[in-house]
Design a protein with these regions (language model features):
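Short beta-alpha connecting loops at secondary-structure transitions
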Residues: 22-25, 85-100, 127-135, 177-190, ...
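Iron-sulfur cluster-binding cysteine motifs and their immediate structural context
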Residues: 163-164, 169-175, 193-251
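Glycine-rich ThDP/TPP pyrophosphate-binding loop and its adjacent helix/strand module
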Residues: 85-177
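Thiamine diphosphate
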Residues: 6-88, 94-101, 145, 278, ...
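Short, ordered loop/turn segments at secondary-structure junctions
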Residues: 12, 81-84, 120-123, 163-164, ...
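Short helix/loop capping segments that flank catalytic or ligand/cofactor-binding pockets
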Residues: 16-19, 60-62, 87-90, 97, ...
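Active-site pocket-lining segments that scaffold enzyme catalytic pockets across diverse folds
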Residues: 1-3
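A short, basic/flexible loop-to-alpha-helix module at the beginning of a structural domain
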Residues: 256-277
Length: 283
């Protein structure tokens, strides 16, 4: 968010920012996003806040909290992450498969003052048919400027941030239902000075430390890289881009894997004549 601004977290992915030193504070249950500020705003010297919300929450009950803010004429901006997956429950598609254009029309009908659509694929919005009249599309690099402009508007405004969940992209690429980008990014350890600016710019977990005789440097973990490429926004000459059908070498020995597997006994299955419960970690 812009320097000096304040934001409120949501649930699920929107809550993760609570622990990331991003000037986000407070949270609520699903469907009550923004309600705390609606009440607080009339007693506060703060002029405006941002409220985070996921697309799954929006479909479930979040639209009601936006309606509440509009009815109360509250000056705030809802930031809706349209990441094309209900991450809280396992990455399912949104109920009803609403498009960004449809959401913008719904928000316009609810009385939202202005809608900004921010995306990493701005070329797919060359046709603006079906979008709300009070909506505009921006490249994600302009997100700070857009937030500053919306914070000046009296009333309730909305940002729809359209970018598919990185984990979901990797799943779809492995399944062959999403094209695998031909470009891979690497870091030349001989040039890297370990400043970490690539991590600051991208906030990406695929930038991993690597210890060298000259100290700690950085490398790109290709197994988790989601091909976002924002790491190259870092102020650094060490990045190397390779394009084409690149095959990475295995970092393990097939014979070793087979040797380990040969020593693993088959599981002993219980004789079941009633219900049997198994606890599995994760969602």
């Amino acid at each position: 968010i812009p320097e000096g601004s304040r934001a409120i977290t949501g649930i699920s992915c929107a809550y993760l920012v609570e622990h990331m030193e991003r000037d986000n504070e407070g949270f609520s249950q699903m469907g009550s996003e923004g309600a705390t500020w609606v009440g607080e705003s009339v007693f506060s010297n703060t002029d405006h806040v941002f409220q985070n919300m996921g697309d799954g929450t929006y479909i479930h009950s979040g639209i009601l909290s936006i309606r509440h803010a509009v009815a109360a004429k509250t000056k705030m901006t809802f930031k809706i992450l349209y990441n094309d997956a209900v991450a809280l429950t396992g990455g399912q598609a949104l109920d009803g498969l609403p498009t960004v254009a449809q959401m913008s029309k719904q928000l316009e009908a609810e009385g939202v003052e202005e809608i900004a659509i921010i995306t990493d694929e701005i070329e797919k919005y060359s046709d603006r048919g079906g979008f709300a009249k009070n909506s505009k599309v921006y490249d994600r690099k302009n997100i700070i400027d857009v937030q500053i402009e919306l914070s000046k508007i009296n009333g309730t405004t909305v940002i729809i941030y359209d970018q598919t969940c990185a984990a979901e992209k990797r799943r779809r690429r492995k399944k062959g239902i999403l094209e695998e980008p031909k470009k891979k990014i690497f870091i030349n350890k001989d040039l890297c000075e370990g400043c970490g600016d690539c991590g600051i710019q991208s906030n990406c977990v695929s930038i991993a430390p690597v210890e060298t005789e000259y100290g700690r440097k950085r490398q790109i973990d290709q197994s988790s890289c989601n091909k976002d490429y924002t790491c190259v926004d870092g102020f650094c000459p060490s990045f190397v881009s390779l394009e084409g059908d690149i095959r990475l070498k295995k970092n393990y020995d097939d014979n070793l894997i087979n040797k380990i597997n040969s020593k693993i006994d088959d599981p002993k299955l219980p004789q079941i004549n009633k219900s049997f419960g198994i606890m599995i970690a994760g969602i």
